[in-house]
Amino acid sequence: MATHFSPRKTSKQDARARARKVRAGLPVLESRPAALLLSAPEVKSATTIAAYWSLPHEPDTHELLNFLKGEVRILLPIVLADWNLDWAEWNGEELVSKKGLWEPSGPRLGIAAIREVNVIITPGLGGDARGARLGQGGGCYDRAFKLAGITPWRVMLLHEEEFSSIDLFEDVHDERVYAISTPTRLIRIP
């Protein structure tokens, strides 16, 4: 039986530690929530999508990105020293491993490139029915969401066990997502 992520209203640091422990116990490649996104109207009509290349214990994005390449413009992030996200276009070329993350090797487009996207597919450690997102703690995506504005559809990928029925704690700078995709459902946030 899987352990479910159950955040209490304590510190976000404690919630992240619990979420990472749950995630570490999940089988690698068990979760493919990205597959549900292919039928979402927001993805079907998109011309530019910002996404990320998932790591082993994250919900898998590889199949989705490989399916979408050539169909839409894909931007992948590059984490800068100040924790902002720069972006580069990805067309299927080999990625470069930097600081434990996979980054595109093409020309950097700048942090403002996020303003060109229709959809932002974001990672997270947990989420709730309000669209609150527990990230890794650097605020990278919160800043990217603010820079992008409210128009791009923001969707977070989670393992089923990482969706919380309890409201997550939020700081004033936290930005919410508009949907959460798990392997079994696409949860639209009202």
Where would I find each of the regions flagged by the language model?
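Surface-exposed, charge/polar-rich loops and edge strands
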Residues: 1-12, 21-25, 70-71, 105-106, ...
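Short capping loops/turns at secondary-structure boundaries
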Residues: 110, 133-134
